[in-house]
Every structure is written in C-alpha cells, then in structure tokens.
C-alpha cells in the first residue's frame, strides 16, 4: 500500500538544459521533493545557484557542480536525469548503471529506446541494467521528453478510428 513519507524525497537534477531547467522548477514546487544537488557539465555553470540556472527569480540554496562523486556521496533518493542521451547513448547507460548500483532511483527523459527496449536493444544490455537495479535496490524509469503525449496517448488517438491494427 502507498504511504505518505514523513521526510521529503531527496533529489539531484542531472543537467540544466531546457528540460533540466523545467525540472529544477518543478522539483522546487513540490513539497514532497527536496532538491539537494545539481550536476552541470558546463564549467561556466559550476557554483551558480540552481534557481538562477533554472531562470527563477530567487536562489534555491543549491549550487551546481560538475563533481559526480560529491553528488553521489549525498546519497540522494533519486536522480532526475535530463542530460542529452540520444548522441551519447552509452554514456547514459553507464550513468544509469552507476546510479542504480549506488541505490539511487533514476527518472530520465531519455534515451527513448529504453522506454521499451525489448527486441530493440541487446538483451545483455537490458539484463545488465536490471541487475544494477536489483543489486542497488533502485529503479529506472525513462519517460521521454514528452510523457503523457507522444509515446502513450498520441498512438491511441491516431488509431482510435482504425478498424484493425496489424502488428
């Protein structure tokens, strides 16, 4: 059964690009979430407050860093991963594996191939991610950049007038 937590879910935001900036603002807006860290790859963003990076008009008291080890050492409950993965697919997989093994849940915008990887990606790759999650007691959810629309609702809408769908 679902229970309400007494303490907020401690979250690290991984990147402050377009989606990452929106994620920082969304995390801040939810009282059940606590932003505890922000990863950036751009040296110019290191040390800048997450609120400013997100385009908010206030500081959130969380300075961005490029120190991966320091962020993992915080022991966050979850990482919201919005770093670009379509052109650095294996980099994303390696990041997810590391986070899962460390016991950190991951919610990611990509790579979209992980939304349903069976029959697309090698089973060994899928099995390795699953094993990392089991070993760390953590989960991975890839929702894409547009959850609730393109990959789940749009196909239903587009096929709603169909009499038959051949798979």
Model-derived features with residue positions:
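Conserved anion/nucleotide-ligand pocket segment
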Residues: 141-167
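Hydrophobic beta-strand scaffold residues
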Residues: 35, 106, 139-140
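N-terminal glycine-/serine-/threonine-rich beta1-alpha1-beta2 phosphate-ribose binding loop
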Residues: 2-101
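Rossmann-fold NAD(P)-binding glycine/threonine-rich loop
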Residues: 93-94, 102, 109-138
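Short, ordered loop/turn segments at secondary-structure junctions
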Residues: 41-43, 84, 104, 110-114, ...
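Short, hinge-like loop/turn segments at secondary-structure boundaries
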Residues: 52-57, 125-128, 158-161
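Gly/Ser/Thr-rich loops at beta-strand to alpha-helix junctions
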Residues: 17-19, 113-116, 121-122, 145-151
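Structural motif
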Residues: 14, 109, 141-145
């Amino acid at each position: 059964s679902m229970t309400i937590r007494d303490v907020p879910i401690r979250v690290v935001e991984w990147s402050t690009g377009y989606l990452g900036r929106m994620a920082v603002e969304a995390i801040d807006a939810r009282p059940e979430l606590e932003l505890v860290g922000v990863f950036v790859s751009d040296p110019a963003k290191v040390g800048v407050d997450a609120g400013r990076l997100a385009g908010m008009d206030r500081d959130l008291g969380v300075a961005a860093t490029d120190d991966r080890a320091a962020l993992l050492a915080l022991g966050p409950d979850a990482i919201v991963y919005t770093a670009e993965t379509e052109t650095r697919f294996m980099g994303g997989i390696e990041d997810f594996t590391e986070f899962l093994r460390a016991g950190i849940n991951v919610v990611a915008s990509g790579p979209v191939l992980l939304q349903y990887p069976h029959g697309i990606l090698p089973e060994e790759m899928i099995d390795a991610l699953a094993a990392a999650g089991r070993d760390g007691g953590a989960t991975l959810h890839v929702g894409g950049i547009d959850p609730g629309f393109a990959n789940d609702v749009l196909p239903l809408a587009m096929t709603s007038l169909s009499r038959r769908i051949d798979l």
